[in-house]
Amino acid sequence: MEWLIAVTGLPFDILILVLLAVAGAFAGFVDSIVGGGGLISVPAMLLTNLPPSVALGSNKLSSIFGAGSASITFLRNHMVDFSLVRKLLPFTFVGSMLGTLAVVSLPPLYVKPIIIILLFCVTLFVVFKKDWGEINRTSQVTGKALYICMAFALGIGIYDGFIGPGTGTFLIMGFIFTGFDFLHASANAKILNFTSNLASLLVFLYLGHVNITYGLATGAGQIIGAYLGSHLAIAKGSSLVRVVFLSVTTVMLLKLVYDYISTL
């Protein structure tokens, strides 16, 4: 850090904010396409020596800006199936609140093996089934399929509040299994991701676990990154989203395995 201060000539406090904004831009870019931006922004927050719970809370504040920026872009381009998404929003909101309340008292150690196995299976599935998520085959989601989507939205909301990074990726998986292509699945996922971030942030704010300054600095970067990422996804379509999806799930899988082994 000393050499950066010497090169830039910036005071330490300002340099931290600049670095967080840069990390936020990268996180927002990736997250707006396939999710997983927390793999960048959460470690960046932790490098500032914030307590883990405050780092998570501050990350939720920054994620609001990134998810909001991407959501607006997708909505303006009519990529969101709002007739379905609006039915899932309450479940994601409540689930995220429950997960956030749990994270302050329960270790995520027991959840990680399940996530690792799930990510591994889905990554292999996407690699070998090359047409998966390439064509938008969805129709009106009703009946049993809708109830499954509601249960999934609740579960993902809990996961987002409890662990966080990768929520958007799992949401995309769920929407693709419903019949959406990668691009429309990403658009739908971003609306729910914004909702879960908001719910979790409200709990963290209530508990006093948010560094407003760091969250806003990272959020400023996220706005720019999410704007660029969502526009690129719309321009390039599902083929780009698929490639980035595989890259992010692979990195996420490796990180989760490393973290899990480190705790044994």
Residue ranges and their predicted role:
Residues 2-51, 136-186, 216:
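Selected transmembrane alpha-helices and immediately adjacent juxtamembrane segments
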Residues 17, 60, 116-119, 123, ...:
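Residues within membrane-spanning alpha-helices of integral membrane proteins
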Residues 21, 25, 29, 60, ...:
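Residue-level signature of the transmembrane alpha-helical core
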Residues 57-110, 117, 197-243, 247:
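Selective hydrophobic functional segments
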Residues 68-79, 116-141, 253-264:
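Transmembrane helix exit motif
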